[in-house]
Amino acid sequence: MSVDIAVVDYGMGNLRSVSKAIEHVAPSATVVVTSSPDVIAEAGRVVFPGQGAARDCMREIDARGLREAIATAARSKPFLGICMGMQVLFEHSEEGDTACLGILPGNVQRFPHEAMHDDRGNKLKVPHMGWNNVHQGAPHPLWSGIEDGERFYFVHSYFVQPTTPDLIAGFSHYPFPFTCAVASGNIFAVQFHPEKSQNAGLTLLGNFVTWNPGEHASACDLSGASCA
C-alpha cells in the first residue's frame, strides 16, 4: 500500500484527532498512523505530533527505533511537527534535562515563574492553555490563506528558543513574545495544535498536504551547513 501521509505514533499524543483532521483536508490521500520506520521512510509526507513530557517522548522514540526515521524524514520530505513534536526537534529541553533529536539548533525552556503576570500584575497560569494570536514572523506557504494574528489553540508549559533567528516563522505572546512556529527546509513545526484550531488549523493542514518545499528555499541548510 502506498502511503501519502504518515502520522508518527510513539505512544504519546492525540493521534486520532490529528489523523482525522488530515483526512478531512485530504480526503483522497492515504493517511496512516504508524510506528514503523519503514512506513515512515516510504511515506510522501510525515506529521510528527505529540504531547506529554520531553524525557518520556525521547524514551518512547528510541524504544521504537524511530530516531533515525524521524531525522531522515525531516531532511528529505515535507515534515510537520506539532506541539511536543516541535520541541524535541531541537537540541535540549529543560524538562527533565533531556537531550532531544538535535535536528534544529536551539533549546526548550519552561515559562519562567517570575515572568508570569499580565500588564495589571495578575498571575498567569502555566500551562499556557487556550486560544492565542499567532503572528507570522516570516512568509511561508503554510501561512497561505491565514491572516496574520489569527488565533490558534495552545496547551504547553515549555517553548522553543531557536539559536538561529531565521528559523522563526511565527510567534505569540504569553506574557512575552515566544516562538510558536519554525521553518527550515522540509520542516515546518508549530507549538499550537492545528487539529484543535478550527478553520485556521484546517487551512494550515491543507497547505501542508500540498506544500512543495523545493519551491520555498530555507535560510538554514539541514545538511550541516551554518544558517545564514
From Swiss-Prot:
The molecular function GO annotations come to: glutaminase activity; imidazoleglycerol-phosphate synthase activity; lyase activity
- What is one GO cellular-component annotation here? cytoplasm
Question: Domain Glutamine amidotransferase type-1: where?
Answer: 4-218
InterPro entries per record? Class_I_gatase-like, GATASE, Imidazole-glycPsynth_HisH
Q: Which domain of life is it from?
A: Bacteria
Task: Enumerate the catalysed reactions.
Answer: 5-[(5-phospho-1-deoxy-D-ribulos-1-ylimino)methylamino]-1-(5-phospho-beta-D-ribosyl)imidazole-4-carboxamide + L-glutamine = D-erythro-1-(imidazol-4-yl)glycerol 3-phosphate + 5-amino-1-(5-phospho-beta-D-ribosyl)imidazole-4-carboxamide + L-glutamate + H(+); L-glutamine + H2O = L-glutamate + NH4(+)
Where does the record say this protein resides?
Answer: Cytoplasm
Entry keyword annotation includes Hydrolase: yes
Instruction: Identify which residues the record assigns to the active site.
Output: C83, H193, E195
What GO terms in the biological process aspect are recorded for it?
A: L-histidine biosynthetic process
Cite the Pfam families for this sequence.
GATase (PF00117)
Q: What is its EC number?
A: 4.3.2.10, 3.5.1.2
Pathway(s) served? Amino-acid biosynthesis; L-histidine biosynthesis; L-histidine from 5-phospho-alpha-D-ribose 1-diphosphate: step 5/9
Q: Print the keywords alphabetically.
A: Amino-acid biosynthesis, Cytoplasm, Glutamine amidotransferase, Histidine biosynthesis, Hydrolase, Lyase
NCBIfam families, per this entry? IMP_synth_hisH
Q: What does this protein do?
A: IGPS catalyzes the conversion of PRFAR and glutamine to IGP, AICAR and glutamate. The HisH subunit catalyzes the hydrolysis of glutamine to glutamate and ammonia as part of the synthesis of IGP and AICAR. The resulting ammonia molecule is channeled to the active site of HisF.
Describe its assembly.
Heterodimer of HisH and HisF.
Tell me what this protein is called: Imidazole glycerol phosphate synthase subunit HisH
Q: Which organism is it from?
A: Thiobacillus denitrificans (strain ATCC 25259 / T1)
